[in-house]
């Protein structure tokens, strides 16, 4: 129990005023004091839910389904006191993502009756839980622009995208307010998981409310209004967007959605979410939003609204200052050479939805759907880095292997547990078998990296920033 949790009187008064009468304040406070259940989402870009369930059963992990996400589970592990969830082999290989159950709901809402997404925007995407969930829902097809304003969070976003084998994402690093003017009516689907006061995160962080005040709620509401307007301008006619927060007050939730109607009138339709999952009606508002208090589903507090754009809007006028784009499409000759080398050395091919782009000695695989947007905005990175050229051919990159390779590849070298631990510590390994050339390294049937045979050892190709120590699986 979080008996020392800080709940300001003004916050409790606000909850008392706005919480539906059928919910109890005593149950709300009791729920806030209970530690949050650990939850994960299976990464179906790497393994199916059934395959993961089999792995979990072998490790005696108990999985309880999350009702609103087919790939989400609350998890209980016998070794939780000795091995952190993030240090399990399955997590490090990208087979699952540690994600709070409530935060899976916005992407579920965005994907409902919306299977054929060609161009999506995740406007505030770090650390990447919803970006990777959306990419998986898109089956790595189309294009997904993942934006993050905070410089310190871009690196972890990039790392999570690579670990999960996502290949259809372009990263941007802007204040989300620029999208409405820079890319008007561009995206058929938009997720705005807005920065907020975080009232719903109390169970995860007992100190979450120490900096809370009614004034801070009003202040952040101004930012949210700007962001939702920008997102609506960037949304195509007929497109859908989801607005979500991990907070509980009406100022940052219902009022922000109603502001959109005040600005754009009949162009805005709220799509009801009462049938999103069984028992969703327990959190349903009169507008059709989901307002999740922590005691309803024993989860974090959350808010989710789904909005459709019925008519065009006039975006703000902007002047773009873009430098020269440093990449060029690979020529047919270059592309054929890259494809042939990738096939002959590693028995791999890039997906049909990607194409080669060149920057100096670097070879990248961009989502084809990004091509019309390349001259419209500045990007932190697009797609994944496939290789670096050198005089003897190509030096394939770790992130490309994580995006492309599967454990049934004929070049794979399967490690035992001790060797896999050595691998993640950045050390070369000496299996009791031999090989030659570059090899895809696997552990328990999951791809974990790229190595190269040097004599009777495999030279470790793990990027330095991924090297781990401590108690691993």
Curated annotation (Swiss-Prot):
Keyword Methyltransferase: yes
Subcellular location: Cytoplasm
Record key words, sorted: Cytoplasm, Methyltransferase, RNA-binding, rRNA processing, S-adenosyl-L-methionine, Transferase
Binding locations of S-adenosyl-L-methionine: 124-130, 148, 175, 193
Enzyme Commission numbers on file: 2.1.1.178
Reaction catalyzed: cytidine(1407) in 16S rRNA + S-adenosyl-L-methionine = 5-methylcytidine(1407) in 16S rRNA + S-adenosyl-L-homocysteine + H(+)
GO MF annotation terms: RNA binding; rRNA (cytosine-C5-)-methyltransferase activity
NCBIfam families in alphabetical order: nop2p, PRK11933.1
UniProt protein name: Ribosomal RNA small subunit methyltransferase F
Organism the protein comes from: Aliivibrio fischeri (strain ATCC 700601 / ES114) (Vibrio fischeri)
Record gene name: rsmF
């Amino acid at each position: 129990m979080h008996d020392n949790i800080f709940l300001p009187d003004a916050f409790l008064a606000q909850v008392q005023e706005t919480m539906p009468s059928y919910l109890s304040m005593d149950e709300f406070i009791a729920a806030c004091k209970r530690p949050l259940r650990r939850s994960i989402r299976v990464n179906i870009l790497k393994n199916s839910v059934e395959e993961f369930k089999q792995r979990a059963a072998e490790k005696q992990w108990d999985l309880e389904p999350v009702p609103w996400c087919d790939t989400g589970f609350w998890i209980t592990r016998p070794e939780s006191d000795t091995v952190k969830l993030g240090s399990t082999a399955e997590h490090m290989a990208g087979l699952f993502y540690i994600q709070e159950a409530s935060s899976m709901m916005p992407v579920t809402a965005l994907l409902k009756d919306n299977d054929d997404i060609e161009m999506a925007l995740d406007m505030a995407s770090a650390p990447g839980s919803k970006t990777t969930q959306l990419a998986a829902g898109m089956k790595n097809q189309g294009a997904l622009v993942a934006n993050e304003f905070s410089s310190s969070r871009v690196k972890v976003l990039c790392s999570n995208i690579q670990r999960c084998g996502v290949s259809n994402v372009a990263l941007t690093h802007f204040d989300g307010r620029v999208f409405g003017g820079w890319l008007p009516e561009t995206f058929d689907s938009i997720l705005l998981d807005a920065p907020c006061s975080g009232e719903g995160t109390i169970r995860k962080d007992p100190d979450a409310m120490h900096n809370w005040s009614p004034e801070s709620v009003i202040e952040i509401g101004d930012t949210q209004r700007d962001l939702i307007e920008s997102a609506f301008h960037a949304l195509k006619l007929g497109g859908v967007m989801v607005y979500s927060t991990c907070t509980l007050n009406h100022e940052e939730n219902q009022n922000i959605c109603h502001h959109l109607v005040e600005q754009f009138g009949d162009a805005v339709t709220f799509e009801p979410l009462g049938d999103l999952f069984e028992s969703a009606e327990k959190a349903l508002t009169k507008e059709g939003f989901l307002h999740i208090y922590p005691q309803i589903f024993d989860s974090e507090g959350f808010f989710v609204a789904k909005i459709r754009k019925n008519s065009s809007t006039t975006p703000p006028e902007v002047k773009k200052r873009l430098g020269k784009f440093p990449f060029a499409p690979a020529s047919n000759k270059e592309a054929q050479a890259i494809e042939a080398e990738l096939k002959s050395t590693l028995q791999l091919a890039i997906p049909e939805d990607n194409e080669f782009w060149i920057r100096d000695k670097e070879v990248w695989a961009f989502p084809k759907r990004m091509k019309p947007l390349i001259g419209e905005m500045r990007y932190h990175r697009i797609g994944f880095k496939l290789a670096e050229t050198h005089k003897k051919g190509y030096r394939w990159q770790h992130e490309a292997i994580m995006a492309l390779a599967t454990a049934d590849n004929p070049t794979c070298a399967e490690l035992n547990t001790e060797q896999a631990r050595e691998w993640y510590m950045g050390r070369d390994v000496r299996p009791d078998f031999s090989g030659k050339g570059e090899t895809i390294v696997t552990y328990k049937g999951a791809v974990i990296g790229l190595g190269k045979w040097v004599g009777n050892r495999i030279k470790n190709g793990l990027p330095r920033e991924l090297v781990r120590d401590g108690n691993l699986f």
